């Protein structure tokens, strides 16, 4: 297992934070993670979580969890609960109670009135379509709204009537009065408040006007005393507006915004809209489908919090973009599970083996280590006359280099004896349904005298093994860039039809019968697996493949 070639991980924010503390600019660092509760967190959010919580922890500060809940039509308590669970699962805890932008709606409203009284905000009656036309483009300046010069008194009256619910959705908006000719389109009189007659999951029906993200964000940071407001690069052009609001309002603190490059992972989609489409159109079983890029999907697949944190450390934090190879994430989980997952044997495609020269009623309880390096104890495998091996480990006409069982050939059973294939029993269609073999009783734990046995295969006892279901998960998309389709199709056209193969009737060693939900294993010679957190039951386990033993994608 070799580590992927990557530049040394860096974090350009560390020296900034250190300098701010050393200079006395801040006595304590306070960061925040501010998700919008309109979907489940995905692997891209993990980078932001690890960055914000990680910096706070490293420098002895605090990190707030604040829900940016300014768009009630798209938000839901389900998402709030899932986000809290995901952050804690990753190993982080926010300072105090979780916070909501809606906690500050009264203060934000008062600050909007402050801007109106200062002549820096006005109520605009342009429709959304008209407002887009007046806004101009990247190459053309905008045009002032015909409502821009309303008096302070008229604006105060109209804003109060907006708040009172007098007007329908979209009829009016409160806008900041900045500069319609600014080369930065975010400064062309941005919207502060929209009319939305929508029930809010936190405030109920108290409000029918809701603040915009840009008006909410910086002021929420200021209220909470955030010292370093860290967001992704697409908000770099919003920073002048962030600073304009702070400069023109009587806020209690002056946070500073910093931007970093978001995580772009190949073979992966992180657009919430597209993830929701996958769920709604039943291309996957839900937000926690193990093929999804959501944290709940990775968790159900068997990824550990440590592997995701280590992955985020590996890729570092910088301002340069680029696409990260998903092989780095797969390396992180392989490295973790290789070190920490107990070993077990599971036969995915069982073929019965009868050892004809083994005593009829004899059973030997063989002890095998649960881990080759760590002291995890042993598990017991009963060995008797009938066992199962994988059907792929026997070939009547073997290809070149085949080192497993062939007619008349020998192979070692893992932790057990050497057996020889004597006869293949077939059904009427010519399918092999049973092997008759003989064993060498002098080969338990040692090589046979005078001959070399190269192959080692896994096995389970026939009588004591437990039947189980195994789900072989693979990458959901077959293209490294699933968003891009050469023929102009949809990202859905890139779905990998082999991203899930369900195998029923698999046979697992007895120690796996009561595997706990989310318990992780290396199935020897097969890969890393975990017991499904929803469907696996005592005596009827269901295992999800987390990742293969080695990277075989595209080989």
Swiss-Prot record:
Domain of life, source organism: Bacteria
Catalytically driven reaction(s): tRNA(Gln) + L-glutamine + ATP = L-glutaminyl-tRNA(Gln) + AMP + diphosphate
Pfam name, any one: tRNA-synt_1c
Location in the cell: Cytoplasm
GO CC list: cytosol
Sequence positions that bind ATP: 36-38, 42-48, 232, 262-263
GO process annotations (BP): glutaminyl-tRNA aminoacylation; glutamyl-tRNA aminoacylation
Sites where the protein binds L-glutamine: 68, 213
GO MF, any single term: ATP binding
Enzyme Commission code(s) on record: 6.1.1.18
UniProt keyword annotations, A-Z: Aminoacyl-tRNA synthetase, ATP-binding, Cytoplasm, Ligase, Nucleotide-binding, Protein biosynthesis
Extent of motif 'HIGH' region: 35-45
Enzyme class label: ligase
Gene3D superfamilies: Glutamyl-trna Synthetase, Domain 2 (1.10.1160.10), Glutamyl-tRNA Synthetase, Domain 3 (3.90.800.10), HUPs (3.40.50.620), Ribosomal Protein L25, Chain P (2.40.240.10)
InterPro entries to which the protein is assigned, alphabetical: aa-tRNA-synth_I_CS, Gln-tRNA-synth, Gln/Glu-tRNA_Ligase, Gln_tRNA_ligase_bac, Glu/Gln-tRNA-synth, Glu/Gln-tRNA-synth_Ib_cat-dom, Glu/Gln-tRNA-synth_Ib_codon-bd, Glu_tRNA_lig_a-bdl
Family the UniProt entry places it in: Belongs to the class-I aminoacyl-tRNA synthetase family.
Subunit structure: Monomer.
PANTHER family referenced in this protein's UniProt entry, alphabetically: GLUTAMATE--TRNA LIGASE (PTHR43097:SF5), GLUTAMINE-TRNA LIGASE (PTHR43097)
Record's protein name: Glutamine--tRNA ligase
Native source organism of the sequence: Stutzerimonas stutzeri (strain A1501) (Pseudomonas stutzeri)
Lineage: Bacteria, Pseudomonadati, Pseudomonadota, Gammaproteobacteria, Pseudomonadales
């Amino acid at each position: 297992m070799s580590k992927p070639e990557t530049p040394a991980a860096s974090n350009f924010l560390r020296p900034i934070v250190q300098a701010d503390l050393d200079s006395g600019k801040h006595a304590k660092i306070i960061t925040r993670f501010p998700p919008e509760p309109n979907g489940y967190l995905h692997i891209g959010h993990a980078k932001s979580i690890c960055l914000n919580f990680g910096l706070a922890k490293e420098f002895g500060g605090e990190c707030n969890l604040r829900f940016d809940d300014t768009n009630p039509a798209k938000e839901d308590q389900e998402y709030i609960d899932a986000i809290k669970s995901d952050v804690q699962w990753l190993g982080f805890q926010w300072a105090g109670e979780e916070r909501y932008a809606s906690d500050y709606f009264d203060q934000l409203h008062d600050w909007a009135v402050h801007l109106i009284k200062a002549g820096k905000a006005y109520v605009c009656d342009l429709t959304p379509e008209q407002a887009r036309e007046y806004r101009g483009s990247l190459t053309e300046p905008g045009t002032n709204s015909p409502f821009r010069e309303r008096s302070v008194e008229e604006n105060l009256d109209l804003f109060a009537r907006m708040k009172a619910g007098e007007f329908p959705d979209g009829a009016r908006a409160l806008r900041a009065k900045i500069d319609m000719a600014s080369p930065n389109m975010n400064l062309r009189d941005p919207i502060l408040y929209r009319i939305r007659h929508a029930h809010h999951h936190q405030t109920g029906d108290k409000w029918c006007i809701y603040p915009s993200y840009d008006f909410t964000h910086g002021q929420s940071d200021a209220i909470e005393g955030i010292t370093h407001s860290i967001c992704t690069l697409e908000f770099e052009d919003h920073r002048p507006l962030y600073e304009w609001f702070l400069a023109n309002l009587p806020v209690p603190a002056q946070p500073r915004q910093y931007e970093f490059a978001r995580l772009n992972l190949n073979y992966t989609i992180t657009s919430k809209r597209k993830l929701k489409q996958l769920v709604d159109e039943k291309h996957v079983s839900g937000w926690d489908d193990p093929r999804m890029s959501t944290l709940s999907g990775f968790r159900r697949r068997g990824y550990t919090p440590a592997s995701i944190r280590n992955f985020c450390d590996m890729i570092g934090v910088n301002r340069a973009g680029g696409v990260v190879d998903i092989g780095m994430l797969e390396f992180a989980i392989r490295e973790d599970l290789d070190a920490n997952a107990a070993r077990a044997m599971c036969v995915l495609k069982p073929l019965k083996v009868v050892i004809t020269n083994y005593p009829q009623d004899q059973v030997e309880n063989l002890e095998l280590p649960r881990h080759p390096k760590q002291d995890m104890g042993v598990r017991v495998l009963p060995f008797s006359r009938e066992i199962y091996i994988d059907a792929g480990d026997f070939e009547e006409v073997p290809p070149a280099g085949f080192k497993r069982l062939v007619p008349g050939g020998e192979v070692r059973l893992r932790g057990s004896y050497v057996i020889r294939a004597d006869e293949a029993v077939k059904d009427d269609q010519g399918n092999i349904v049973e092997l008759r073999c003989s064993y060498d009783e002098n080969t338990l734990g040692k090589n046979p005298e005078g001959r070399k046995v190269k192959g080692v295969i896994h096995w389970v006892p026939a009588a004591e093994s437990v039947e189980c279901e195994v789900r072989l998960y693979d990458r959901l998309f077959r293209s490294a860039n699933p968003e891009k389709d050469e023929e102009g199709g949809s990202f859905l056209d890139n779905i990998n039809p082999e991203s899930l193969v369900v195998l029923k009737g698999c046979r697992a060693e007895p120690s796996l019968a009561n595997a706990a939900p989310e318990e992780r294993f290396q199935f020897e010679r097969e890969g890393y697996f975990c017991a499904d957190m929803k469907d696996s039951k005592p005596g009827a386990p269901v295992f999800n493949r987390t990742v293969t033993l080695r990277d075989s994608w595209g080989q």
